[in-house]
């Protein structure tokens, strides 16, 4: 049986940080931000990195896309990989350079999905086509 990813999961684009800033500092709450460098550091066994924060308008907090344990993020810029978020990332803001995926009712193992997305030759080929012409300077 075949399913589209959107049929078995919630796919959410990360938030643009400038859109959640408070107009008045006293109306803001500080939240940690998930970054690509954190995920790369963790892949390389580095765990003592700094976690940047953002000031968020308190009225916008309830609509934030916050990281949850075992959800998946896919980097849309230089990372271009899927990563399963662990406990230490819970509550971090997922910024606009990521898409997050949460599977419904455990229908798919997030680690299997991340492995498949990152390692399957056909998916790699499709990713290369999608990012062709995009580069970081």
Q: Whereabouts are the PLM-identified features?
A:
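Non-catalytic DNA-recognition/assembly elements of restriction-modification systems
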Residues: 1-22
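Short, basic/aromatic beta-hairpin or loop at an interaction surface
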Residues: 38-53
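Proline-centric
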Residues: 1-7, 99-110, 124, 136-137
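Short coil/turn segments at secondary-structure boundaries
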Residues: 18-26, 48-49, 128-130
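A short beta-sheet element
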Residues: 56-64, 69-120
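Short proline/glycine-enriched turn/loop segments at secondary-structure junctions
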Residues: 23, 88-89, 135-137
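Specificity-determining recognition surfaces
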Residues: 119-137
């Amino acid at each position: 049986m075949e399913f589209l990813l959107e049929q078995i999961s919630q796919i959410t684009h990360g938030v643009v940080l400038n859109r959640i800033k408070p107009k008045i500092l006293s109306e803001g709450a500080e939240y940690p931000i998930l970054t690509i460098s954190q995920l790369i550091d963790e892949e390389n066994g580095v765990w003592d990195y700094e976690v940047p924060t953002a000031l968020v308008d308190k009225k916008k907090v309830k609509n934030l896309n916050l990281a949850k344990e075992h959800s998946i993020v896919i980097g849309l810029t230089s990372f271009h990989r899927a990563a399963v978020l662990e406990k230490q990332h819970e509550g971090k803001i997922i910024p606009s350079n990521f898409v997050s995926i949460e599977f419904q009712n455990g229908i798919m193992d997030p680690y299997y999905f991340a492995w498949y997305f990152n390692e399957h030759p056909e998916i790699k080929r499709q990713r290369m086509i999608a990012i062709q012409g995009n580069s970081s300077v």
